[in-house]
């Protein structure tokens, strides 16, 4: 492209290189602009160049950006007009390892969309939420979580023209295993204090928790989960949005209510409460926990609408997988609709410490 450039004709610039860096901190670029008196107008739309192509392999010993840091960052980045494509990304961060592929593309309206598929190996959950500012939501924060996280994540995240993430537009699906974990002072769990002693619910420790999850339309969907702990044996399902509105459906075996750790239900529970017999002589109490606005409430799940939540989850899951497959080919075609859920086993497996 250089001869055309010298002649004054439009020409694409092509770069191929290997880059090695001891330390990289993108925030220092802005500091240098401020030191030289250059204007930093953050309201200007960010536009990717239309006449640039490059392939760069990179090795970065230390990467820092705001509250996030990583070591031994390696990978390759390819750029063609309006598309950054990062492949074979590998880095050590958050006390573990992260690897995967991702891309960022600019739309015709100057907005952006990011897409990625990542694998996580033994990263610290609390440090992750702290580094990413709780991912822009308030319903579960760093102080509510503890443990080591491994798993996989497929993600679509839109950005506006200023490269600000649009959290409400996030679409994601993944599988994870949390080891040596804890759920601490989590409000929906604390609402069960009418039935379980509050001291048992403040911090719930578990040895291992395995599950899949997905996020769409501003909701985190939680399929049925069997929880066995020293606090109680529960079955939980529900959904939780990023504005901290939630609806959970909880099933507690009535035999648990006779133990010393659980409070007895209000009088006339069997007459007015919602109970269920599993056919084996084990009767369960059905509860519903709802929070809309600032007020949370626990009630008997008389209509057992947990079944409707379960159906909603199945529908949203199929829709999500279609989106990820049709737009980015993240899943094989036969895995989107043909695969039937296992009706015998819950999607969650929780192994609790004795």
Task: Name what the model sees in each region.
Residues 1, 10-34, 49-64, 74-78, ...:
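Small-residue helix/turn framework positions
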Residues 3-5, 16-18, 304-312:
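Surface-exposed edge beta-strands and adjoining flexible/disordered loops or tails in beta-rich
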């Amino acid at each position: 492209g250089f001869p055309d450039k010298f002649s004054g004709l439009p020409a694409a610039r092509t770069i191929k290189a290997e880059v090695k860096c001891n330390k990289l901190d993108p925030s220092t670029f802005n500091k240098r602009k401020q030191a030289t008196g250059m204007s930093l107008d953050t309201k200007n739309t960010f536009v990717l160049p239309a006449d640039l192509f490059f392939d760069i392999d990179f090795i970065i010993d230390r990467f820092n950006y705001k509250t996030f840091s990583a070591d031994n960052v390696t990978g390759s980045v390819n750029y063609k007009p309006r598309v950054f494509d990062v492949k074979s990304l590998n880095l050590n961060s958050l006390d573990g390892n992260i690897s995967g592929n991702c891309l960022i593309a600019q739309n015709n309206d100057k907005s952006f969309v990011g897409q990625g598929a990542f694998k996580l190996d033994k990263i610290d959950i609390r440090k992750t939420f702290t580094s990413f500012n709780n991912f822009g939501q308030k319903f579960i924060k760093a102080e509510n979580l503890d443990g080591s996280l491994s798993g996989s994540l497929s993600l679509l995240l839109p950005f506006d023209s200023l490269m600000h993430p649009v959290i409400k537009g996030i679409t994601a699906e993944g599988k994870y295993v949390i080891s040596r974990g804890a759920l601490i002072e989590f409000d929906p769990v604390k609402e069960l204090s009418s039935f379980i002693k509050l001291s048992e619910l403040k911090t719930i420790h578990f040895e291992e928790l395995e599950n899949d999850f997905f996020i769409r339309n501003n909701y985190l969907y939680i399929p049925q989960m069997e929880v066995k702990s020293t606090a109680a044996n529960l079955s939980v399902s529900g959904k939780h949005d990023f504005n901290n509105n939630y609806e959970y459906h909880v099933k507690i075996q009535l035999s648990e209510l006779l133990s010393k750790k659980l409070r007895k239900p209000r009088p006339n529970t069997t007459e007015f409460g919602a109970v269920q017999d599993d056919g084996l002589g084990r009767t369960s109490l059905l509860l519903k926990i709802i929070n809309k606005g600032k007020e949370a409430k626990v009630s008997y799940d008389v209509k057992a609408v947990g079944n409707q939540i379960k159906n909603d989850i199945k529908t949203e899951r199929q829709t999500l997988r279609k989106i990820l497959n049709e737009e980015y080919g993240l899943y094989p075609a036969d895995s989107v609709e043909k695969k039937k859920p296992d009706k015998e086993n819950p999607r969650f497996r929780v192994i609790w410490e004795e």
